Amino acid sequence: MNITATVLLAFGMSMDAFAASIGKGATLHKPKFSEALRTGLIFGAVETLTPLIGWGMGMLASRFVLEWNHWIAFVLLIFLGGRMIIEGFRGPDDEDEEPRRRHGFWLLVTTAIATSLDAMAVGVGLAFLQVNIIATALAIGCATLIMSTLGMMVGRFIGSIIGKKAEILGGLVLIGIGVQILWTHFHG
């Protein structure tokens, strides 16, 4: 695979993480760049590992992985999105309430895993091609780092406009990504 194809693949794989990061950024009270970078690093690290895991699985049992990865991503994203929507409806904006300035590490890891299962499936497919899987996985991780950090900052802007309802929007985005993954699986 040439460099152009690798870069296009990398940024294509980062789009789900970008959308999820917008939702995450919108739900925080003015996240700092360091929080956006933290999110980008977590999403990028997970997105680097999943094609490597997929590649290894592709060498062993590609049929099972391809058969179930979309369902796993769908369920995780519906769960996380539903949780965000419920949080968004819990009470009005409250001036006395301490605004959230960062997401928990494990929440970000779970979201990153859910949005990177397509990269695992790509890794399975790459097992059957002549590619440098390490370079490809690093390219996907770097693109995801960039796009997730950018997504958090875009989300910051959106969140400052719509306030606590951003939690509902973020949840809807995650559910939308889950539905899109399932739709793409069944309708190509």
UniProtKB/Swiss-Prot annotation:
Keywords: Cell inner membrane, Cell membrane, Ion transport, Manganese, Membrane, Transmembrane, Transmembrane helix, Transport. One of its GO terms (molecular function) is manganese ion transmembrane transporter activity. Its main location: membrane. The chain crosses the membrane at residues 3-23, 66-86, 106-128, 143-163, 168-188. It is a multi-pass membrane protein. Signal peptide: none annotated. Probably functions as a manganese efflux pump. Belongs to the MntP (TC 9.B.29) family. This is Probable manganese efflux pump MntP. It comes from Escherichia coli O7:K1 (strain IAI39 / ExPEC).
